Amino acid sequence: MNIRRKNRLWIACAVLAGLALTIGLVLYALRSNIDLFYTPGEILYGKRETQQMPEVGQRLRVGGMVMPGSVQRDPNSLKVTFTIYDAEGSVDVSYQGILPDLFREGQGVVVQGELEKGNHILAKEVLAKHDENYTPPEVEKAMEANHRRPASVYKDPAS
């Protein structure tokens, strides 16, 4: 192999290594910004296709209905705890902040936060359903069977 071919080979290897390093760093940086969507049942039992359950400390978005009678407000702060449910289960959520004006029991919400031990969500953001005609597609798909069932049938299997 002559010197010219060797130099081209080294340059090609260096470009490929640089490209691989760049892709790896971009994916690592984006990893902290990716929030996966789950329903309460998927947190308890895993995603349907893969049966993969979220890990403690994982950032995620959870969509469900606010269970009637579950909203508890701390009178000395802005801390609120409530339960969201779907056809397969329920999870507890705690949130520190001002809730959206449209937030109420029996209404659809999407919470964004971290999963803690005991299937508890520490929410950083709470989004309430905007009006009667719009539901995010993920929530609508997960909630289509819930409107006819009473909230009392949704219990956490761990309790």
UniProtKB/Swiss-Prot annotation:
Amino acid composition bias (Basic and acidic residues), ranges on this chain: 132-147
Localization terms from the record: Cell inner membrane
Ranges in a coiled coil: none
Keywords: Cell inner membrane, Cell membrane, Cytochrome c-type biogenesis, Heme, Iron, Membrane, Metal-binding, Signal-anchor, Transmembrane, Transmembrane helix
Annotated region (Disordered), positions in chain: 132-159
One GO CC term on file: plasma membrane
Residue ranges crossing the lipid bilayer per the database entry: 9-29
Entry superkingdom: Bacteria
Residue ranges that the UniProt entry lists as topological domain Cytoplasmic: 1-8
InterPro entries tied to this protein: CcmE (IPR004329), CcmE-like_sf (IPR036127), NA-bd_OB-fold (IPR012340)
Molecular functions (GO terms): heme binding; metal ion binding
GO BP field: cytochrome complex assembly
Topology feature Periplasmic, residues: 30-159
Membrane topology: Single-pass type II membrane protein
Binding of heme, residues: 130, 134
Family: Belongs to the CcmE/CycJ family.
Listed PANTHER family: CYTOCHROME C-TYPE BIOGENESIS PROTEIN CCME HOMOLOG, MITOCHONDRIAL (PTHR34128:SF2)
Annotated function: Heme chaperone required for the biogenesis of c-type cytochromes. Transiently binds heme delivered by CcmC and transfers the heme to apo-cytochromes in a process facilitated by CcmF and CcmH.
Protein name: Cytochrome c-type biogenesis protein CcmE
Organism: Escherichia coli O8 (strain IAI1)
Organismal lineage: Bacteria, Pseudomonadati, Pseudomonadota, Gammaproteobacteria, Enterobacterales
Designated gene of the protein: ccmE
